[in-house]
Amino acid sequence: MLVLGIETSCDETAAAIVKDGREVLSNIVYSQIEIHNQFGGVVPEIASRKHVEKISYVADMALKEADIDIDKIDAVAATYGPGLVGSLLVGLSFAKALSYARKIPFIAINHIEGHIYANFITYPKLKPPLIVLVVSGGHTNLIILEDFDRYEVVGKTRDDAAGEAFDKIARYLGLGYPGGPAIDKVARHGDEEKYKYPLADVEGYNFSFSGLKSAVINHVHTLNQRRENFKVEDVAASFQKAVVDTLVEKTIKLSLESNIKRVAIAGGVAANSKLREELSKRCSEHQIEFYVPDFKYCTDNAAMIASAGYFKLIKGQTSSYSTNAVPYISLVSKKE
C-alpha cells in the first residue's frame, strides 16, 4: 500500500512516498533555513508563502524519485497540527484537494505523533511496546507506546520544550538559527563540567526547562556585567549536559519502572549527538534496547507522516475534509 505524505508545519516543505508504512520510496524536503536564518527564527508569513510556491513541485519530485504514477497512490496523509497555522493550511489544503480529485482516502496526522513513526522506518522490524521520548522545538513528551496508534503520555514539559530552550539559549549566545545544531556543534569544544546549572525538580515524568533557560541567561549576563572572561563553548556544553541529563534520567526511570526494555527517541532534538550518546550508554548499562531514527528522519519530514498515515489507514481511520489546521495541539493519551 502506497501513502503520499505531506508535511508543512513549520519551515520545511516536504513530500514522501512510503510503502506499507516502513519502506521509503522517496523523501523530498525543501528547507527554508537559509531564508529564516537572517531573521534569527522562522517568520510565519514568509514560511507560508514559500510553502505555496514549493508544495506542488515537492510532491511532483516525490513521485518522480519513487518512479510512481499518481494513479498508484492509495492514500494521502498530511500534518494538521501543531505548527504555524498558515504553513499547516498549505499542506492540508493540498492533501485534501488531491484526495478529492483522485478519490483516495485522506488522513490528518498530529505532527508529534508522526515523529514517533520515524523509528518504524529506520527499524522495519520494530514493534510496540516501547518507551518513546519525543523531543522537538515545541514539545517534549515521554510516552508508553502500547501498540500502533495506542499510547499513554506519562510525561510532558510544564513550560518550554527542550528544543525551544536550545533555540533561545543559542540566540542569546549569538550562535544563530536553528539553535539545536548550533549548540551541539560548539559544545563539542567546551567543558560540560565548567558550570552547574540547576534543573527544576518536577514531579513524576514531567519536565521543566524555563528555569534552566533563565539561569543560563542570568549567569551569562552577570559574567558580562563583571567583565569576566568565559567561553561560549563552556556555557553551551554545560547547558546541553543539564538538558540531556534530565531527559535521559526520566526516560531510563520509566523504562525500568514499566519493565519495558525498549527505548526510542524521536523529534528534532533526537539528532543531538550528546543525547544519542548518553541515552545509548545508559540503555546499554541497563540491558535496554535503544532505537534512534536516521538523522534525516529526526528533523521534519513527510516520510514519518506517510508512515503514521499508513498505520491509521489499515485500521480504517480516515479523516473528513472538514478537518482544519490546529496550530496549538498537544499529544494526549490514545486508547482504542
Curated annotation (Swiss-Prot):
Subcellular location: Cytoplasm
Gene3D superfamilies: 3.30.420.40
The family this protein is said to belong to: Belongs to the KAE1 / TsaD family.
A Pfam family recorded for this sequence: TsaD
EC number: 2.3.1.234
One annotated GO molecular function: iron ion binding
One GO cellular component, as annotated: cytoplasm
Top EC category: transferase
Cofactors that this protein relies on: Fe(2+)
CC cofactor note: Binds 1 Fe(2+) ion per subunit.
UniProt entry keywords in alphabetical sequence: Acyltransferase, Cytoplasm, Iron, Metal-binding, Transferase, tRNA processing
Catalytic activity line of the entry: L-threonylcarbamoyladenylate + adenosine(37) in tRNA = N(6)-L-threonylcarbamoyladenosine(37) in tRNA + AMP + H(+)
Protein name as it appears in the record: tRNA N6-adenosine threonylcarbamoyltransferase
Binding locations of substrate: V134, V135, S136, G137, G138, D167, G180, D184, N272
Gene Ontology BP annotations: tRNA threonylcarbamoyladenosine modification
InterPro entries: ATPase_NBD, Gcp-like_dom, KAE1/TsaD, TsaD
Residues bound to Fe cation: H111, H115, D300
Role of this protein: Required for the formation of a threonylcarbamoyl group on adenosine at position 37 (t(6)A37) in tRNAs that read codons beginning with adenine. Is involved in the transfer of the threonylcarbamoyl moiety of threonylcarbamoyl-AMP (TC-AMP) to the N6 group of A37, together with TsaE and TsaB. TsaD likely plays a direct catalytic role in this reaction.
